[in-house]
Amino acid sequence: MSFDTAKYPTLALVETPDELRLLPKESLPKLCDELRQYLLDSVSRSSGHFASGLGTVELTVALHYVYNTPFDHLVWDVGHQAYPHKILTGRRDRISTIRQKGGLHPFPWRDESEYDVLSVGHSSTSISAGLGMAVAAEREGKGRRTVCVIGDGAITAGMAFEAMNHAGDIKSDLLVVLNDNEMSISENVGALNNHLAQLLSGKLYASLREGGKKVLSGLPPIKELVKRTEEHLKGMVVPGTLFEELGFNYIGPVDGHDVQALSHTLKNMRSLKGPQLLHIMTKKGKGYAPAEQDPISWHAVPKFDPASGTLPKSKEGAQPTYSKIFGQWLQETAAKDSKLMAITPAMREGSGMLQFSRDYPQQYFDVAIAEQHAVTFAAGLAVGGYHPIVAIYSTFLQRAYDQVIHDVAIQSLPVLFAIDRGGIVGADGQTHQGAFDLSFLRCIPNMIIMTPSDENECRQMLHTGYHYQKGPTAVRYPRGNGTGTELTPLSELPIGKGVVRRQGKTVAILNFGTLLPEAQAVAEKLNATLVDMRFVKPLDEALLEELAQSHSTFVTLEENAVMGGAGSGVNEFLMAKRLAVSVLNIGLPDVFIPQGSQEEIRVDLGLDAAGIERRITQWME
């Protein structure tokens, strides 16, 4: 998309923050209007995260206007809201390539720009990293400042509070901006708090406060009275007691869409010592009415027509997604079992649980961004005689690994893990690919791991795992649509048993998961035996021994890291049994996989049918 200087005359003057800081303060509102419109025009043409960025336009402009970035460090939590930041930091003309193969990274990324001081993608990491940067800056002694921007959702995670507790203890110079888009501010409250924020962040108030502390330090009763009086006065208009208790100087809440007032407050706060928290109120989707009214649907969007105010509907005849299949199975099972308890760490819509949460509110728990708690909470439910299901993305299960081992597996508790987004996820890049779950789960004792090849198998495996009471189970399924296979009545599968789909000669393709259609095409061409292994753990050892008697070559196929994955399990078994079979392991390579469409990535990695066939024939030459 070419940049229209006539449509964006103020934004045209700003390629980098250095140029932004040359603008008069009076022109900042106009810049924000143009930046918001440019974001709308760009994302509607290219797809991407949308509503969050619309809500942080004024904050982004104010931060780069006041702080000397990139010398000063600006850390974005998660990064969904950082599109305006990318536009203002030398990437304006490439923003339409975001999330595409070879394009801009979907999140702040260190390799992409000196303004991206921390690569992000998962939530609640900013304050911990920012505190480390602040300590390093103090040791450096050059006056570098550190700012962390975190949302009201991300700040609920335990890691964020751990970091704030540490910051309050060591008292490093750090600003945390809490971007709160869950509330709306009336005009009067907003004006009052904006004025209060400017007073409380000013040098006069800060010096009086610190000076008063020193004078009164020897008079405990008076000091305590003054402290309580200050807290009562501030408590009348600000909800900052929790942050003050953690050792932060709290300012706010203020209107996050008044760029001039925000700049003034930030300028005051830049010189304050110790940990500071600025609480701003914003509107997710600000400036585009459909996104304001439904920010969840407009959080991440495909290409759309801004004039229509609607998102494109799914293609007619498209098969249901695996997430939807899971949600339907939940509904079906809960209707028969009041002890079913479904848990999600803030991924209700993504995991296909929206309708379930409405129909069965007493059996549904959204624990917020708290993956560790989600798993141990499930363990407690299992101890109490209930049947917990943890619905979680593969990439986020990584955050609760110790809980899976310590709180569930060691105790052989019957918790079902419904692992969504297993394998290649696509446009969100390195931080979101589900590349490692089979590897890190396979080594855990007492764990049953299933990999469905289609949506019907997915249902049967969920049913099997749900009724397995000897320990934890995991069903791992991908992002995307099913194959259209017929859904059959639910029944329990025999644990650890695969199915031979095609009988061939010499080569046996052992498929784990939804690459089965590609494997089928290759097996037909090579006259190979094709096995739907179904279980990563336990493996169908009897079937493997039988196949080893009649085949000289095994090819394992999975959308997981080759290192430690399902294929590694096959290798270990063959070596333990001293079976003379050569093995080719096909899966994800030992790299972090960048963004692109799922189809593009599979072709690049040789995981499409042509690539699989090519790798097998070349290996056998």
Curated annotation (Swiss-Prot):
**Gene this protein is translated from:** dxs
The UniProt keywords, alphabetically, are: Isoprene biosynthesis, Magnesium, Metal-binding, Thiamine biosynthesis, Thiamine pyrophosphate, Transferase
EC main group: transferase
Name the Gene Ontology molecular function terms of this record. Answer: 1-deoxy-D-xylulose-5-phosphate synthase activity; magnesium ion binding; thiamine pyrophosphate binding
**What job does this protein perform?**
Catalyzes the acyloin condensation reaction between C atoms 2 and 3 of pyruvate and glyceraldehyde 3-phosphate to yield 1-deoxy-D-xylulose-5-phosphate (DXP).
Tell me the lineage of the source organism: Bacteria, Pseudomonadati, Pseudomonadota, Gammaproteobacteria, Enterobacterales
What stretch or stretches form a coiled coil here?
Answer: none
Protein name in UniProt: 1-deoxy-D-xylulose-5-phosphate synthase
**NCBIfam families per record:** dxs, PRK05444.2-2
- Oligomer status and interactors: Homodimer.
Cofactors needed by this protein, per the record, are: Mg(2+); thiamine diphosphate
Q: How is the cofactor bound?
A: Binds 1 Mg(2+) ion per subunit. Binds 1 thiamine pyrophosphate per subunit.
Matches recorded under CDD domains? TPP_DXS, TPP_PYR_DXS_TK_like
Report the sequence similarity comment from the record: Belongs to the transketolase family. DXPS subfamily.
The pathway is: Metabolic intermediate biosynthesis; 1-deoxy-D-xylulose 5-phosphate biosynthesis; 1-deoxy-D-xylulose 5-phosphate from D-glyceraldehyde 3-phosphate and pyruvate: step 1/1
Q: Name one Pfam family in it.
A: Transketolase_C
- EC no. given is 2.2.1.7
Per the record, what is one GO cellular component? Answer: cytosol
Which reaction is recorded as catalysed by this protein? D-glyceraldehyde 3-phosphate + pyruvate + H(+) = 1-deoxy-D-xylulose 5-phosphate + CO2
Q: Which domain of life is it from?
A: Bacteria
Key word Metal-binding present: yes
Question: Which positions bind thiamine diphosphate?
Answer: H80, G121, H122, S123, G153, A154, N181, Y288, E371
| GO terms (BP aspect) | 1-deoxy-D-xylulose 5-phosphate biosynthetic process; isopentenyl diphosphate biosynthetic process, methylerythritol 4-phosphate pathway; terpenoid biosynthetic process; thiamine biosynthetic process
Positions with a binding annotation for Mg(2+) = D152, N181
